[in-house]
Amino acid sequence: MDPEGLQFLLPPASLAALANSWLQEDCPGLNFASLVTGSAPAQAVLWAKSPGVLAGRPFFDAIFTQLNCQVSWLLPEGSKLVPVVKVAEVRGPAHHLLLGERVALNTLARCSGIASAAATAVEVATSTGWAGHVAGTRKTTPGFRLVEKYGLLVGGAECHRYDLGGLVMVKDNHVVAAGSMEKAVLKARQAAGFPLKVEVECSSLKEALQAAEAGADLVMLDNFKPEELHPTAATLKAKFPNVSVEASGGVTLDNLPQFCGTNIDVISLGMLTQAAPALDFSLKLYAEGDIPVPHARRS
């Protein structure tokens, strides 16, 4: 999917609400630093200072839109960043530009970091010849899920389910609460109706076969070592060829190739949203007529 088109997935009302909440969090009261700058027109350059994938432009825009500032992008969403590179220019009242600076940088850095990790994971997996899907998980930061899931998409990975309503997932605790695997899956099937699929988390071949027999659409083989994963998936697929198999738990960028196999349809990595390092961006003001530089020095 073209990263530039992903912006249309984001509800404008959600973008505005998120931007407003982030700005409110950072400045809920008096902003004394604004007295230093006043409201004179100002301009700044956004610099990327670490390599990776650019992601999060719609959120960056939404923040500065709230502050009556204009952003002009020099690179498209999904661009590969080779530092140091000029990414965008921002213009607006000085006090508003600086009010949005840190919030916008934090959002862009986090989203780009996730996109970069996702892009690396997809590249690692496809380099093995595997044709399945790399996905994130629901292990996201409360209040920041839209940004993080969007970053996965820009990086070429799948969201998995966005929230609890996107897929009925039966986990080990559901099985305990329901009384048995069969009861849990049957109740999930009834709740799902025709629009939703049912996925069941399994920790053994026995559980996987029970889940498929009960009507699961997807079986997650959770925390399997690669040497156990592939024989289990092969046995499951041989008996239930229409059931999709997901590998999850303990997967990192380093060991990802070991989880790729012909009987694995999806590999999900919690680390894409939990452990991806943020990229380094800076926003530097410059005087009209001066040449913008990434590291401004006072003389």
UniProtKB/Swiss-Prot annotation:
Top EC class of this enzyme: transferase
EC number of the protein: 2.4.2.19
Region (Important for hexamer formation) location: 8-12
Organism, as annotated: Rattus norvegicus (Rat)
GO CC terms of this entry: catalytic complex; cytoplasm
Family matches, as NCBIfam families: nadC
Residues given in the record as quinolinate binding sites: 102, 138-139, 160-161, 171, 201, 222, 248-250, 270
Pathway: Cofactor biosynthesis; NAD(+) biosynthesis; nicotinate D-ribonucleotide from quinolinate: step 1/1
UniProt keywords, alphabetically: Glycosyltransferase, Pyridine nucleotide biosynthesis, Transferase
Translocase in keyword set: no
Catalytic activity entry: nicotinate beta-D-ribonucleotide + CO2 + diphosphate = quinolinate + 5-phospho-alpha-D-ribose 1-diphosphate + 2 H(+)
GO MF, any single term: identical protein binding
Regions crossing the membrane: none
Name the UniProt record assigns to this protein: Nicotinate-nucleotide pyrophosphorylase [carboxylating]
GO biological process, one term: quinolinate metabolic process
Top-level taxon: Eukaryota
Cited InterPro entries: Aldolase_TIM (IPR013785), NadC (IPR004393), NadC/ModD (IPR027277), Nicotinate_pribotase-like_C (IPR036068), Quinolinate_PRibosylTase_N_sf (IPR037128), Quinolinate_PRibosylTrfase_C (IPR002638), Quinolinate_PRibosylTrfase_N (IPR022412)
Subunit structure: Hexamer formed by 3 homodimers.
Function: Involved in the catabolism of quinolinic acid (QA).
Family label: Belongs to the NadC/ModD family.
